Protein backbone atom coordinates (compact mmCIF):
# COMPACT_ATOMS: atom_id res chain seq x y z
CA UNK A 1 0.00 0.00 0.00
CA UNK A 2 1.53 3.28 -1.13
CA UNK A 3 -0.01 5.27 1.72
CA UNK A 4 1.47 2.93 4.32
CA UNK A 5 4.90 3.08 2.68
CA UNK A 6 4.72 6.87 2.52
CA UNK A 7 3.75 7.14 6.18
CA UNK A 8 6.54 4.86 7.43
CA UNK A 9 9.13 6.64 5.27
CA UNK A 10 7.95 9.88 6.88
CA UNK A 11 8.25 8.67 10.49
CA UNK A 12 11.38 6.59 9.89
CA UNK A 13 10.01 3.29 11.19
CA UNK A 14 10.02 0.01 9.25
CA UNK A 15 6.74 -1.63 8.26
CA UNK A 16 6.93 -5.39 8.83
CA UNK A 17 3.57 -7.14 8.28
CA UNK A 18 2.81 -9.79 10.85
CA UNK A 19 0.03 -11.53 12.71
CA UNK A 20 -0.81 -12.05 16.36
CA UNK A 21 -2.35 -15.14 17.94
CA UNK A 22 -6.06 -14.48 18.49
CA UNK A 23 -8.86 -16.15 20.43
CA UNK A 24 -12.50 -15.12 20.52
CA UNK A 25 -14.62 -14.72 23.62
CA UNK A 26 -18.40 -14.41 23.79
CA UNK A 27 -21.06 -13.40 26.32
CA UNK A 28 -23.83 -15.08 24.33
CA UNK A 29 -24.31 -17.79 21.73
CA UNK A 30 -21.91 -16.06 19.34
CA UNK A 31 -18.92 -18.24 18.32
CA UNK A 32 -16.10 -18.10 20.85
CA UNK A 33 -15.14 -19.20 24.34
CA UNK A 34 -18.13 -18.63 26.59
CA UNK A 35 -17.63 -16.15 29.42
CA UNK A 36 -19.58 -16.95 32.57
CA UNK A 37 -19.61 -15.97 36.22
CA UNK A 38 -21.68 -17.09 39.19
CA UNK A 39 -23.98 -14.87 41.23
CA UNK A 40 -21.83 -15.72 44.26
CA UNK A 41 -18.70 -14.38 42.53
CA UNK A 42 -20.37 -11.02 42.01
CA UNK A 43 -21.01 -10.73 45.74
CA UNK A 44 -23.91 -8.83 47.33
CA UNK A 45 -22.48 -5.32 46.88
CA UNK A 46 -21.61 -5.57 43.19
CA UNK A 47 -24.74 -7.55 42.39
CA UNK A 48 -26.91 -4.93 44.12
CA UNK A 49 -25.24 -2.10 42.21
CA UNK A 50 -25.79 -3.96 38.96
CA UNK A 51 -29.52 -4.16 39.73
CA UNK A 52 -29.57 -0.49 40.81
CA UNK A 53 -31.14 -1.33 44.18
CA UNK A 54 -31.72 1.16 46.96
CA UNK A 55 -30.14 0.83 50.41
CA UNK A 56 -32.98 -1.24 51.86
CA UNK A 57 -33.00 -3.64 48.92
CA UNK A 58 -29.21 -3.95 49.07
CA UNK A 59 -29.60 -5.00 52.70
CA UNK A 60 -32.03 -7.73 51.64
CA UNK A 61 -29.56 -9.04 49.05
CA UNK A 62 -26.77 -9.04 51.65
CA UNK A 63 -28.88 -11.04 54.10
CA UNK A 64 -29.89 -13.48 51.36
CA UNK A 65 -26.24 -14.10 50.49
CA UNK A 66 -25.54 -14.69 54.19
CA UNK A 67 -28.50 -17.08 54.48
CA UNK A 68 -27.27 -19.08 51.48
CA UNK A 69 -23.75 -19.22 52.91
CA UNK A 70 -24.98 -20.41 56.32
CA UNK A 71 -27.24 -23.08 54.84
CA UNK A 72 -24.87 -24.25 52.08
CA UNK A 73 -27.05 -23.12 49.20
CA UNK A 74 -24.74 -22.31 46.25
CA UNK A 75 -25.84 -19.23 44.29
CA UNK A 76 -24.66 -20.05 40.79
CA UNK A 77 -27.24 -18.63 38.39
CA UNK A 78 -30.28 -16.36 38.41
CA UNK A 79 -32.64 -19.32 38.89
CA UNK A 80 -30.93 -20.01 42.21
CA UNK A 81 -31.53 -16.48 43.46
CA UNK A 82 -35.13 -16.46 42.24
CA UNK A 83 -35.82 -19.77 43.99
CA UNK A 84 -34.32 -18.46 47.25
CA UNK A 85 -36.54 -15.36 47.04
CA UNK A 86 -39.58 -17.57 46.45
CA UNK A 87 -38.68 -19.82 49.38
CA UNK A 88 -38.08 -16.95 51.81
CA UNK A 89 -41.47 -15.41 51.04
CA UNK A 90 -43.44 -18.68 51.31
CA UNK A 91 -42.56 -21.92 53.11
CA UNK A 92 -39.27 -20.71 54.58
CA UNK A 93 -40.48 -17.28 55.67
CA UNK A 94 -41.12 -18.09 59.32
CA UNK A 95 -37.80 -19.87 59.91
CA UNK A 96 -35.85 -17.19 58.00
CA UNK A 97 -37.38 -14.28 59.92
CA UNK A 98 -36.75 -16.02 63.24
CA UNK A 99 -33.02 -16.18 62.45
CA UNK A 100 -32.34 -13.14 60.25
CA UNK A 101 -35.21 -10.74 60.86
CA UNK A 102 -38.17 -9.66 58.79
CA UNK A 103 -37.83 -8.62 55.16
CA UNK A 104 -40.44 -6.56 53.34
CA UNK A 105 -42.32 -8.24 50.50
CA UNK A 106 -42.12 -4.96 48.57
CA UNK A 107 -38.32 -5.27 48.56
CA UNK A 108 -38.33 -8.90 47.43
CA UNK A 109 -40.89 -8.03 44.77
CA UNK A 110 -38.70 -5.24 43.42
CA UNK A 111 -35.64 -7.50 43.39
CA UNK A 112 -37.58 -10.16 41.49
CA UNK A 113 -38.65 -7.63 38.85
CA UNK A 114 -35.05 -6.42 38.48
CA UNK A 115 -33.92 -10.02 37.95
CA UNK A 116 -36.51 -10.51 35.22
CA UNK A 117 -35.30 -7.29 33.56
CA UNK A 118 -31.73 -8.58 33.68
CA UNK A 119 -32.84 -11.90 32.18
CA UNK A 120 -34.40 -10.01 29.27
CA UNK A 121 -30.92 -8.70 28.42
CA UNK A 122 -29.51 -12.21 28.12
CA UNK A 123 -28.02 -12.56 31.60
CA UNK A 124 -29.34 -16.11 31.88
CA UNK A 125 -26.58 -17.24 29.52
CA UNK A 126 -23.93 -15.31 31.43
CA UNK A 127 -24.58 -16.48 34.99
CA UNK A 128 -23.50 -20.05 35.64
CA UNK A 129 -20.56 -22.41 35.49
CA UNK A 130 -17.82 -22.94 34.53
CA UNK A 131 -16.66 -19.48 35.57
CA UNK A 132 -14.07 -17.80 33.37
CA UNK A 133 -10.58 -17.84 34.87
CA UNK A 134 -9.05 -14.37 34.32
CA UNK A 135 -5.55 -15.86 34.43
CA UNK A 136 -6.33 -17.42 31.04
CA UNK A 137 -5.89 -13.90 29.67
CA UNK A 138 -2.17 -14.10 30.49
CA UNK A 139 -1.45 -17.15 28.34
CA UNK A 140 1.23 -17.09 25.65
CA UNK A 141 1.64 -19.30 22.60
CA UNK A 142 4.50 -21.69 21.84
CA UNK A 143 6.61 -18.79 20.52
CA UNK A 144 6.15 -16.79 23.70
CA UNK A 145 3.74 -14.31 22.13
CA UNK A 146 0.90 -12.96 24.21
CA UNK A 147 -2.53 -13.93 22.91
CA UNK A 148 -5.04 -11.29 21.84
CA UNK A 149 -8.47 -12.16 23.26
CA UNK A 150 -11.28 -10.46 21.35
CA UNK A 151 -14.69 -10.27 22.99
CA UNK A 152 -17.36 -10.34 20.28
CA UNK A 153 -20.14 -7.81 20.89
CA UNK A 154 -22.14 -8.13 17.68
CA UNK A 155 -25.33 -9.06 19.55
CA UNK A 156 -24.72 -7.08 22.77
CA UNK A 157 -25.33 -3.60 21.33
CA UNK A 158 -28.84 -3.45 22.80
CA UNK A 159 -27.86 -5.03 26.13
CA UNK A 160 -25.71 -2.37 27.85
CA UNK A 161 -26.47 -3.56 31.38
CA UNK A 162 -25.16 -7.06 30.61
CA UNK A 163 -21.97 -5.68 29.07
CA UNK A 164 -21.29 -3.15 31.83
CA UNK A 165 -21.99 -5.77 34.50
CA UNK A 166 -19.58 -8.21 32.88
CA UNK A 167 -16.81 -5.61 32.57
CA UNK A 168 -17.23 -4.56 36.18
CA UNK A 169 -17.12 -8.16 37.35
CA UNK A 170 -14.04 -8.81 35.20
CA UNK A 171 -12.23 -5.82 36.71
CA UNK A 172 -13.25 -6.90 40.21
CA UNK A 173 -12.03 -10.45 39.57
CA UNK A 174 -8.70 -9.21 38.20
CA UNK A 175 -8.24 -6.95 41.21
CA UNK A 176 -9.04 -9.78 43.63
CA UNK A 177 -6.75 -12.37 42.02
CA UNK A 178 -3.74 -10.51 40.63
CA UNK A 179 -0.98 -9.55 43.12
CA UNK A 180 0.13 -6.00 43.81
CA UNK A 181 2.80 -4.87 41.33
CA UNK A 182 3.18 -1.15 41.99
CA UNK A 183 4.70 0.86 39.13
CA UNK A 184 5.90 -1.44 36.35
CA UNK A 185 7.77 -0.67 33.12
CA UNK A 186 5.09 -2.37 31.10
CA UNK A 187 1.73 -3.86 32.16
CA UNK A 188 1.23 -7.62 32.33
CA UNK A 189 -2.23 -7.25 30.81
CA UNK A 190 -3.93 -4.51 28.80
CA UNK A 191 -7.68 -4.25 28.31
CA UNK A 192 -8.98 -2.32 25.30
CA UNK A 193 -12.67 -1.64 25.80
CA UNK A 194 -14.06 -0.74 22.39
CA UNK A 195 -17.50 0.85 22.08
CA UNK A 196 -16.91 2.08 25.63
CA UNK A 197 -20.19 3.98 25.61
CA UNK A 198 -21.92 0.60 26.06
CA UNK A 199 -20.56 0.51 29.61
CA UNK A 200 -21.75 3.97 30.52
CA UNK A 201 -25.03 4.24 28.59
CA UNK A 202 -27.96 3.90 31.00
CA UNK A 203 -25.58 2.93 33.82
CA UNK A 204 -26.76 3.93 37.27
CA UNK A 205 -24.78 6.37 39.41
CA UNK A 206 -23.90 3.51 41.76
CA UNK A 207 -22.51 1.46 38.88
CA UNK A 208 -20.48 4.41 37.58
CA UNK A 209 -19.04 5.00 41.06
CA UNK A 210 -18.02 1.35 41.25
CA UNK A 211 -16.33 1.49 37.82
CA UNK A 212 -14.42 4.61 38.86
CA UNK A 213 -13.22 2.92 42.05
CA UNK A 214 -12.10 -0.18 40.14
CA UNK A 215 -10.12 1.88 37.62
CA UNK A 216 -8.31 3.61 40.47
CA UNK A 217 -7.46 0.39 42.26
CA UNK A 218 -6.55 -1.87 39.37
CA UNK A 219 -3.56 0.18 38.19
CA UNK A 220 -1.53 -1.09 41.15
CA UNK A 221 -2.00 -4.63 39.80
CA UNK A 222 0.02 -3.93 36.65
CA UNK A 223 -3.08 -3.72 34.48
CA UNK A 224 -3.64 -1.15 31.73
CA UNK A 225 -7.11 -0.08 30.57
CA UNK A 226 -7.95 1.77 27.37
CA UNK A 227 -11.46 3.10 26.74
CA UNK A 228 -12.02 3.34 22.99
CA UNK A 229 -14.90 5.48 21.74
CA UNK A 230 -15.68 7.84 18.89
CA UNK A 231 -16.35 10.79 21.14
CA UNK A 232 -14.69 11.61 24.49
CA UNK A 233 -18.06 12.86 25.78
CA UNK A 234 -19.15 9.19 25.89
CA UNK A 235 -16.94 8.75 28.97
CA UNK A 236 -18.04 10.39 32.25
CA UNK A 237 -15.76 13.12 33.57
CA UNK A 238 -15.14 11.17 36.78
CA UNK A 239 -13.71 8.28 34.76
CA UNK A 240 -11.94 10.48 32.22
CA UNK A 241 -10.05 12.12 35.06
CA UNK A 242 -8.53 8.76 36.04
CA UNK A 243 -6.93 8.13 32.64
CA UNK A 244 -3.24 8.95 32.31
CA UNK A 245 -2.81 8.47 28.54
CA UNK A 246 -5.03 10.27 26.06
CA UNK A 247 -4.91 9.67 22.31
CA UNK A 248 -7.40 11.86 20.48
CA UNK A 249 -8.10 11.45 16.77
CA UNK A 250 -9.99 13.97 14.65
CA UNK A 251 -13.40 15.27 15.69
CA UNK A 252 -15.80 16.75 13.16
CA UNK A 253 -18.23 19.58 13.90
CA UNK A 254 -21.45 19.65 11.90
CA UNK A 255 -23.73 21.27 14.49
CA UNK A 256 -23.54 23.74 17.35
CA UNK A 257 -23.72 20.81 19.75
CA UNK A 258 -20.70 19.23 18.02
CA UNK A 259 -18.71 22.45 18.44
CA UNK A 260 -19.52 22.56 22.15
CA UNK A 261 -18.40 18.92 22.51
CA UNK A 262 -15.11 19.70 20.75
CA UNK A 263 -14.53 22.69 23.01
CA UNK A 264 -15.13 20.48 26.05
CA UNK A 265 -12.77 17.79 24.69
CA UNK A 266 -10.07 20.42 24.16
CA UNK A 267 -10.35 21.47 27.80
CA UNK A 268 -9.48 17.92 28.89
CA UNK A 269 -5.95 18.31 27.47
CA UNK A 270 -3.04 20.19 29.06
CA UNK A 271 -2.74 23.79 27.89
CA UNK A 272 -0.24 24.14 25.05
CA UNK A 273 1.54 27.25 23.73
CA UNK A 274 1.97 25.49 20.37
CA UNK A 275 -1.57 24.40 19.50
CA UNK A 276 -5.03 25.87 19.48
CA UNK A 277 -6.46 22.55 20.60
CA UNK A 278 -10.11 22.98 19.65
CA UNK A 279 -9.06 24.03 16.14
CA UNK A 280 -6.47 21.33 15.52
CA UNK A 281 -8.91 18.63 16.67
CA UNK A 282 -11.02 19.35 13.58
CA UNK A 283 -8.00 19.47 11.25
CA UNK A 284 -6.35 16.15 12.10
CA UNK A 285 -6.03 13.76 9.16
CA UNK A 286 -6.12 9.96 8.93
CA UNK A 287 -3.48 8.40 11.17
CA UNK A 288 -2.92 11.62 13.14
CA UNK A 289 -3.69 12.25 16.80
CA UNK A 290 -3.05 14.51 19.77
CA UNK A 291 -1.24 12.62 22.52
CA UNK A 292 -0.49 13.31 26.16
CA UNK A 293 0.57 10.94 28.94
CA UNK A 294 1.86 11.00 32.51
CA UNK A 295 5.62 11.15 33.07
CA UNK A 296 7.50 9.23 35.76
CA UNK A 297 6.46 11.87 38.30
CA UNK A 298 2.79 11.56 37.41
CA UNK A 299 2.71 14.94 35.66
CA UNK A 300 0.95 15.24 32.25
CA UNK A 301 3.42 15.57 29.38
CA UNK A 302 3.09 18.47 26.93
CA UNK A 303 0.52 17.92 24.20
CA UNK A 304 1.99 16.54 20.97
CA UNK A 305 0.57 16.28 17.45
CA UNK A 306 1.67 12.81 16.30
CA UNK A 307 1.71 10.76 13.13
CA UNK A 308 0.81 7.16 13.93
CA UNK A 309 2.33 4.08 12.34
CA UNK A 310 -0.02 1.78 10.46
CA UNK A 311 -1.13 -1.48 12.09
CA UNK A 312 1.20 -4.26 10.99
CA UNK A 313 -1.54 -6.86 11.30
CA UNK A 314 -4.40 -7.45 8.90
CA UNK A 315 -6.95 -4.62 8.64
CA UNK A 316 -10.00 -6.45 7.37
CA UNK A 317 -13.10 -8.34 8.46
CA UNK A 318 -12.73 -12.05 9.17
CA UNK A 319 -14.88 -14.44 7.18
CA UNK A 320 -17.15 -16.83 9.14
CA UNK A 321 -15.01 -19.74 7.94
CA UNK A 322 -11.90 -18.07 9.40
CA UNK A 323 -13.64 -17.49 12.73
CA UNK A 324 -14.71 -21.13 12.79
CA UNK A 325 -11.17 -22.30 12.06
CA UNK A 326 -9.80 -20.20 14.93
CA UNK A 327 -12.44 -21.50 17.34
CA UNK A 328 -11.93 -25.12 16.28
CA UNK A 329 -8.33 -25.04 17.46
CA UNK A 330 -8.92 -22.84 20.50
CA UNK A 331 -8.23 -24.54 23.85
CA UNK A 332 -10.47 -21.98 25.59
CA UNK A 333 -13.49 -22.82 23.45
CA UNK A 334 -13.26 -26.48 24.43
CA UNK A 335 -12.57 -25.58 28.07
CA UNK A 336 -15.65 -23.37 28.49
CA UNK A 337 -18.06 -24.84 25.93
CA UNK A 338 -19.81 -27.34 28.21
CA UNK A 339 -22.21 -25.95 30.81
CA UNK A 340 -21.83 -27.38 34.32
CA UNK A 341 -25.20 -27.76 36.04
CA UNK A 342 -24.34 -29.04 39.50
CA UNK A 343 -26.67 -29.08 42.47
CA UNK A 344 -27.25 -25.57 43.73
CA UNK A 345 -29.81 -23.52 45.66
CA UNK A 346 -32.54 -24.07 43.06
CA UNK A 347 -32.35 -27.87 43.17
CA UNK A 348 -31.89 -28.05 46.95
CA UNK A 349 -34.85 -25.79 47.74
CA UNK A 350 -37.05 -27.39 45.06
CA UNK A 351 -36.46 -30.79 46.66
CA UNK A 352 -37.12 -29.31 50.09
CA UNK A 353 -40.41 -27.78 48.96
CA UNK A 354 -41.45 -31.04 47.29
CA UNK A 355 -40.67 -32.97 50.48
CA UNK A 356 -42.72 -30.47 52.47
CA UNK A 357 -45.65 -30.87 50.08
CA UNK A 358 -45.33 -34.67 50.28
CA UNK A 359 -45.28 -34.54 54.09
CA UNK A 360 -48.35 -32.28 54.04
CA UNK A 361 -50.14 -34.69 51.69
CA UNK A 362 -49.29 -37.64 53.92
CA UNK A 363 -50.58 -35.75 56.94
CA UNK A 364 -53.90 -35.02 55.20
CA UNK A 365 -54.29 -38.69 54.24
CA UNK A 366 -53.45 -39.77 57.79
CA UNK A 367 -56.06 -37.36 59.18
CA UNK A 368 -58.67 -38.71 56.76
CA UNK A 369 -57.88 -42.30 57.78
CA UNK A 370 -58.04 -41.40 61.47
CA UNK A 371 -61.40 -39.68 60.98
CA UNK A 372 -62.73 -42.70 59.05
CA UNK A 373 -61.64 -45.09 61.81
CA UNK A 374 -63.29 -42.88 64.42
CA UNK A 375 -66.57 -42.85 62.47
CA UNK A 376 -66.44 -46.64 62.01
CA UNK A 377 -65.75 -47.15 65.70
CA UNK A 378 -68.80 -45.05 66.62
CA UNK A 379 -71.10 -47.09 64.37
CA UNK A 380 -69.68 -50.34 65.72
CA UNK A 381 -70.43 -49.20 69.24
CA UNK A 382 -73.97 -48.35 68.23
CA UNK A 383 -74.65 -51.73 66.63
CA UNK A 384 -72.90 -53.69 69.37
CA UNK A 385 -75.25 -52.28 72.03
CA UNK A 386 -77.71 -55.00 73.38
CA UNK A 387 -80.69 -52.66 73.47
CA UNK A 388 -80.02 -51.58 69.93
CA UNK A 389 -79.85 -55.20 68.78
CA UNK A 390 -83.17 -55.99 70.55
CA UNK A 391 -84.92 -53.00 68.99
CA UNK A 392 -83.59 -54.04 65.62
CA UNK A 393 -84.97 -57.57 65.98
CA UNK A 394 -88.39 -56.29 67.12
CA UNK A 395 -88.66 -53.85 64.23
CA UNK A 396 -87.65 -56.57 61.78
CA UNK A 397 -90.24 -59.00 63.21
CA UNK A 398 -93.09 -56.49 63.04
CA UNK A 399 -92.20 -55.57 59.48
CA UNK A 400 -92.22 -59.23 58.51
CA UNK A 401 -95.65 -59.82 60.10
CA UNK A 402 -97.10 -56.81 58.38
CA UNK A 403 -95.80 -57.95 55.03
CA UNK A 404 -97.15 -61.51 55.45
CA UNK A 405 -100.56 -60.14 56.51
CA UNK A 406 -100.80 -58.17 53.32
CA UNK A 407 -100.04 -61.34 51.38
CA UNK A 408 -102.77 -63.28 53.30
CA UNK A 409 -100.35 -65.48 55.15
CA UNK A 410 -100.65 -65.99 58.88
CA UNK A 411 -97.48 -65.52 60.83
CA UNK A 412 -96.67 -68.06 63.51
Locations of the language-model features?
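Generic beta-strand/beta-sheet core signal
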Residues: 25-27, 151-154, 192-194, 199, ...
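Hydrophobic alpha-helical scaffolding
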Residues: 33, 51-54, 101, 204, ...
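P-loop NTPase motor domains
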Residues: 1-213, 239, 283-284, 345
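Generic, well-ordered alpha-helical scaffold segments in large soluble proteins
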Residues: 64-67, 114-121, 169-177, 199, ...
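Long amphipathic alpha-helical segments used for membrane anchoring, targeting, substrate engagement
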Residues: 363-412
Amino acid sequence: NAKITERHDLIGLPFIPGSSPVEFLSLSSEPGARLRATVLEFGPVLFSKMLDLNETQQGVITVIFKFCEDHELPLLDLEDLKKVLQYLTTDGKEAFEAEYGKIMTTSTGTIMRKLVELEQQGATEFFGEPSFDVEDLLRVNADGQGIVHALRLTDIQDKPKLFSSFMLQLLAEIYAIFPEEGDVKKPKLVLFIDEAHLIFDNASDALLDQIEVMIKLIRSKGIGIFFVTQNPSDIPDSVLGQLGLKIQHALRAFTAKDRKSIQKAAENFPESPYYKVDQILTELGIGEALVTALNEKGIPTPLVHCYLRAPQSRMDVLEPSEIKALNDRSPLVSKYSEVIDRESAHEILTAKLEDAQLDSHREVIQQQRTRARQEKSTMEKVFSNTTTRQIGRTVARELTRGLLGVLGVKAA
